[in-house]
Amino acid sequence: MKKSKLYTRTGDRGMTNMADGARVSKGSEDIEAYGTIDELNCNIGYLVSLLPSNREIVSELEHIQTTLFEIGNQLTQTPSSANPNMNANGTSLSENTGCIINHPDNQHNYTPDVSRLELLIDETDAELPELRSFILPGGTPASAYAHVCRAVCRRLERCLVRLSDRRPVPHVVIIYVNRLSDYLFILARKLNFIDKIPEKTIAKTCR
């Protein structure tokens, strides 16, 4: 069987396909959000490469990578029609399950993933000294890069919020990304703590 070519030339004029075939501009908020998900996933992949001996953290980060891939796949589905159960932000969060009514053919409930991150954050925070001031990103290469991932994650959150102003975005996805940035921050602290690297703190000043 002949191998297909990687390039198609269909995007040479600045347009690309959504998962359902809809054509959108590569400069759209949709593509900005999906691209930032991919960027975060790649950065986390590089962080994983800096942690060859810590299988527990690597396993968790790879689980996060898979979740991000699933989120990106879900969001590439174009909402075909307005859902009467959605609120003004395009979401409907069940009080009992946290399940989002969105993209009927590709629903996923990320509430357990949020809970998993919250448990990780709480467990990790309990291991670390109390944080009494702001800290400078840095320390070990892995810790410094966890901060890079955190910053990209915050940018992803901003992209998703902007996108949600225009089209349905599951609210639980935004919650997940928000919590993920918190986890990446606490992970950066843990990585320095493991290697006994002191944190560099800065005083909060008014200028």
Go through the PLM ranges and name each one.
Residues 1-207:
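Phosphate/pyrophosphate-binding loop motifs in nucleotide- or prenyl diphosphate-using proteins
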